[in-house]
């Protein structure tokens, strides 16, 4: 990247990007041995968005990513393309959207001052929008047919939901108005190695398998909210939980623990999404504690080896500053002995001054810390930050209501 600050500023402003943190070259003192891990909820990215290479919102998102230049990038809310997704074409391979994003946007420089980055994609099935066939919201209806999904607006903004879509989504294993909506994509630089045969996923783990499950109760009868047949099958993860081992050039394996728990809310007096969010976050605590109930989708039980370095990444939809008892799980995760919870990414002082209503560690426009890159305590942390645009660079159609969050780590020999 060129080092002339005014040249950079003008070029990046043209794509809605102004320096909100130090560029990669300035932030990392030893790039050869350092890894930048970043999470970014880009907000409801659809297959139809990714089939084209000129979607304005994705171009701006890609510019931000290229500026920050992560080695490992988790994108939340990218559709896992599959049958039932309105943008899916019969006969195409499933789960190809991460590759589309890497090819159409990230590999192509989004400004003269930026460089394209070559990433290898990891995209795996999720529960969102996959219908359960059960009445999970207790409204007396089961509507298993995907309704008509509104097309994307011409300005590139996020498509609206419909009542029919919400009715369908409320009975899916994780809320989504069509199969695969709000999925996840992990993108890893080509000079690192994804150990694909060792990936563990926990998409199918049933909630009742957790011994101390936070069971939602009907506030009138104080009986379990879910009917027995629904509770027997209810999955814990609203999207999925992934353990993706990434081998670094020196041979060290870094485990990427990726997830996107359900948002607390949108659920009525029983607060079933609060309960679920709590236990989805707690699943990572239990995984670090090597709990035996944690069984992956291949049938292997147990958690992460006690010496394994890792980063917990994703939009956890939980703010530790929220006094609710349901946020105890995220506080336990941050305070876990195996987690370096003292590292709190923050916005730069200049960007904080631009929006004083936000706390320095807020990662969402709606004033909350919900997006995380939590390094293990056996990693050396070199730098961290929350990237925010300047007010002058905010486009009429926002890229997302979340900000990119990044941490630079190094594995000590």
Q: Locations of the language-model features?
A:
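Active-site His/acidic residue clusters
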Residues: 254-276
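Solvent-exposed loop/turn segments at secondary-structure junctions
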Residues: 42-47, 78-82, 126-131, 192-194, ...
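N-terminal, active-site-proximal structural segment of metallo-dependent hydrolase catalytic domains
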Residues: 22-184, 214-235, 250-254, 393, ...
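C-terminal motif of bacterial Sec signal peptides marking the signal peptidase cleavage site
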Residues: 18-20
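Bacterial N-terminal signal peptides that target proteins for export
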Residues: 1-9
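Stable alpha-helical elements in mature extracytoplasmic
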Residues: 54-61, 94-101, 179-183, 240, ...
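Bacterial N-terminal signal peptides
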Residues: 9-16
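Metal-dependent phosphoester-hydrolase catalytic domains
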Residues: 187-211, 236, 245-248, 273-312, ...
């Amino acid at each position: 990247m060129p080092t002339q600050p005014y040249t950079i500023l003008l070029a990046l402003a043209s794509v809605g990007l102004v320096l909100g943190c130090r560029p990669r070259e300035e932030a990392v003192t030893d790039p050869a041995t350092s890894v930048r891990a970043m999470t970014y909820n880009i907000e409801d990215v659809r297959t139809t968005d990714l089939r084209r290479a000129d979607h304005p919102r994705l171009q701006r998102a890609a510019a931000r990513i290229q500026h920050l230049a992560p080695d490992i990038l988790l994108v939340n809310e990218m559709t896992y393309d599959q049958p039932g997704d309105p943008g899916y074409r019969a006969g195409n391979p499933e789960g190809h959207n991460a590759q589309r994003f890497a090819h159409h946007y990230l590999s192509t420089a989004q400004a003269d001052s930026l460089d394209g980055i070559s990433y290898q994609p990891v995209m795996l099935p999720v529960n969102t929008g996959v219908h359960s066939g059960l009445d999970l919201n207790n409204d007396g209806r089961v509507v298993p047919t995907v309704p008509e999904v509104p097309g994307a607006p011409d300005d590139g903004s996020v498509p609206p939901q419909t009542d029919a879509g919400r009715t369908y989504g409320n009975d899916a294993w994780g809320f989504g108005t069509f199969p695969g909506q709000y999925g996840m994509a992990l993108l890893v630089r080509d000079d690192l190695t994804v150990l694909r045969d060792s990936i563990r996923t926990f998409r199918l783990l049933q909630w009742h398998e957790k011994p101390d499950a936070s069971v939602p109760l009907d506030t009138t009868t104080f009986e379990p909210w879910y009917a027995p047949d629904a509770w027997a099958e209810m999955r814990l993860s609203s999207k999925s939980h992934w353990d993706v081992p990434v081998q670094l050039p020196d041979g060290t394996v870094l485990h990427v623990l990726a997830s996107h728990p359900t948002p607390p809310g949108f659920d009525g007096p029983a607060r079933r999404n609060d309960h679920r969010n709590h236990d989805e976050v707690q699943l990572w605590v239990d995984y670090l504690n090597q709990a035996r109930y944690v069984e992956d989708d291949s049938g292997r039980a147990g958690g992460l080896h006690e010496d394994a370095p890792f980063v917990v990444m994703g939009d956890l939809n939980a703010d530790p500053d929220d006094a609710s008892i349901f946020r105890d799980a995220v506080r336990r995760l941050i305070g876990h002995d195996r987690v370096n919870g003292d590292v709190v990414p923050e916005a730069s002082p200049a960007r904080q001054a631009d929006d004083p209503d936000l706390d320095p560690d807020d990662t969402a426009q709606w004033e909350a810390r919900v997006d995380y890159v939590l390094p293990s305590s056996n990693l050396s942390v070199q730098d961290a930050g929350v990237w925010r645009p300047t007010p002058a660079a905010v486009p009429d159609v926002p890229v997302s209501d979340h900000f990119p969050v990044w941490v630079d780590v190094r594995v000590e020999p």
